[in-house]
Amino acid sequence: MRINGLYTPYWYRDVVDLLERASDRLDQIMIPKVGCAADVYAVDALATAIELAKGRHKPITFEVIIESAAGLTHVEEIAASSPRLVAMSLCAADFAASMGMQTTVIGGTQENYYMQHGENQYWSDPWHWAQAAIVAACRTHGVLPVDGSFGDFSDDTGYLSLIHISEPTRPY
């Protein structure tokens, strides 16, 4: 269940209401716009207190969404921030906005963002470096890296390409 971001006044009530009412039926909370480990600590401390007060038997787990330059800068400490953290993903649209990137397609390539080689233009992947940083932090700390969104529903080829490059590598 995705809660409101910690920059809003609503996240606290989201966590309290979810954990007090859902009992053990709820497995995971998705925390958006995580910018540093303290964001995860805040939700973890609140969740721990509620679980103890309510006698919850199954600890809730977290998936965090990296959506800002700050989040990517602190991705290593975020990945190590809590034993509840089991998954992490990148939100390309909000990340692009925080970076001041000119983007019109969520998760896809951008016009005029290419490498020129002679007469040929080769599209670059503007998200590769951010995704690679997230995957490295996740692999280091035993967290599952989850691919982010792809918002251009009219681009079947781009979507299939994203699926292909997102598949985990398999040993030969």
Question: How would you name each of these model-derived features?
Answer:
Residues 63-79, 120-127, 152-160:
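Active-site glycine- and acidic-residue-rich loops that bind
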Residues 163-172:
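Single conserved hydrophobic/aromatic residue that forms the stacking wall/gate
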